[in-house]
Design a protein with these regions (language model features):
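Cytoplasmic helix-loop-helix junction between adjacent transmembrane helices
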Residues: 115-149
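Conserved MFS/SLC helix-loop-helix module at the cytosolic interface between two early adjacent transmembrane helices
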Residues: 71-107
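Helix-to-loop junctions at the C-terminal end of transmembrane segments
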Residues: 72-85, 272-285, 366-367
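C-terminal transmembrane helical hairpin of 12-TM major facilitator-type secondary transporters
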Residues: 283-330
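Helix-loop-helix hairpin linking two adjacent transmembrane segments in secondary transporters
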Residues: 137, 146-197
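Intracellular juxtamembrane helix-capping segments at the cytosolic ends
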Residues: 125-138, 324-338
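A late C-terminal transmembrane helix in Major Facilitator Superfamily
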Residues: 337-371, 379
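Extracytoplasmic gate region of multi-pass secondary transporters
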Residues: 41, 221-263, 267
Length: 408
């Protein structure tokens, strides 16, 4: 007889979101939702070079994109069970297209902040619809590993091509890239299921010896705590990702070297998605997540002490690998709790709100002449808070619903 920890947790019924076409449509839609966030270091650097804004103003611009991402995600979480998901994705794509075109029309700070905010809203709609649809699958770790593997490959290409585009056309070339990327995705949307039929977050434990055991309901405070942890972790992401390129330049490291490390860091992180899927089947999702956050705290502390070519390269490789690794498990935990996508749709909101405020906070630290070491200390503290929250959540799941606590 299996113990409840050894039971499998499954949803009931046939799942249209597990079909290959539905997964492909959601993943491709995710390109438009995550492109700016993943390419933020080079985009910020290009804006600085082309438009000559201060560090604080660059933080405001980065926050505009991420603030829009937050709003788009919140809107999606309210609408995802009420409105055709294809319509949500299409509206988001049209916003991305129009707002990126508008970004090419004015070099002034306020108009550019407004257009970047609108682009962020569109990206948030796309990203949240993507995550909500993938959350409807019955194999969360595997599905999100595939999703993030494809995104990392795409973003490695972005890090390769952006310096070339920037060198020829400046920051406007990058805005046009995002515009052109969104157009063909419109034709993939019909593959996505329109609605999720199951309206509850009920799951059932399947005992391998005796069949169905019991229905489990996860208390709502646990997924909300998970979203808080996502927010805290993305304070790290927003501050580090917005200023890591600037931090290297400040100590005399060439932009070509930094761009190369960023590209290879993305390639290296591909192995993290495969490892995450394997570890999830072997150890569940919470234990690898907690370990990865411990490593991330240490990485940020190393960079807080000293920034040079060696520590910068180490931090970029470590950050790139564990960022993707952590995201697989954060999304997977929420998907196990709620297949309707309501909480998963709020993940981009948590990410976007954190990335909206993090560059501004980091910019303020720099404006007070505290240096990039202070920014890295902020990153370490944010990762530590997320670590503490997930330790608590894992403990509560072991007590309340152990079948989910160590589920893959």
């Amino acid at each position: 007889m299996k113990t409840i920890n050894e039971n499998r947790v499954e949803t009931l019924g046939t799942n249209r979101f597990d079909k290959p076409g539905a997964i492909v449509a959601a993943i491709v839609l995710g390109f438009a939702g995550t492109g700016v966030a993943m390419g933020l270091p080079l985009l910020v650097g290009s804006i600085a070079t082309s438009l000559h804004f201060t560090d604080l103003q660059l933080g405001w611009l980065a926050s505009s994109d991420m603030g829009g991402l937050f709003l788009g995600s919140v809107l999606t979480s309210f609408l995802i069970t009420r409105i055709n998901r294809r319509y949500l994705g299409a509206f988001g794509l049209f916003l991305v297209i129009l707002a990126n075109y508008a970004s090419t029309q004015s070099p002034e700070l306020i108009p550019l902040m407004l257009s970047r905010f609108c682009a962020g809203v569109g990206a948030g709609l796309c990203y949240a619809t993507c995550t909500a649809s993938l959350a409807g699958t019955n194999h969360a770790a595997r599905t999100f590993s595939i999703f993030l593997f494809v995104l990392v490959a795409m973003n490695a290409f972005i890090f390769y091509i952006f310096p070339i585009i920037d060198g020829k056309w400046g920051v406007n070339g990058l805005f046009i890239f995002y515009l052109l990327e969104a157009i063909p995705i419109l034709f993939i949307l019909p593959l996505m299921p329109k609605y999720y039929d199951e309206e509850t977050d009920k799951v059932v434990t399947i005992n391998e010896d005796s069949g169905p055991d019991t229905h489990l309901h996860v208390p709502s405070f646990l997924p909300r705590l998970c979203l808080t942890a996502v927010f805290s972790f993305y304070i790290l992401v927003g501050a580090y990702w917005a200023y890591v390129e600037r931090a290297g330049v400040a100590v005399g490291i060439s932009t070509d070297f930094i761009s190369g490390i960023l590209t290879w860091g993305q390639v290296f992180s591909l192995s993290g998605t495969a490892l995450a899927a394997w570890l999830a089947k072997r150890y569940g999702q919470s234990k690898p997540l907690i370990f990865a956050l411990c490593v991330m705290v240490g990485t940020m502390l190393v960079l807080a002490v000293s920034i040079d070519r060696t520590t910068l390269a180490f931090s970029i490789f470590s950050f790139s690998f564990f960022w993707i690794f952590i995201d697989v498990f954060q999304l997977g935990v929420l998907s196990n709790i709620d297949h309707s996508g309501h909480y998963a749709a709020l993940v981009p909101a948590s990410q976007g709100s954190a990335q909206a405020v993090a560059p501004t906070i980091a910019g303020m630290l720099l404006s007070y002449q505290l240096g990039y070491g202070a920014v890295m200390m902020l990153c370490a503290a944010a990762a530590a808070v997320a670590l503490i929250i997930y330790l608590f959540v894992y403990r509560q799941l072991l007590i309340l619903v152990p079948g989910i606590a160590d589920s893959d």
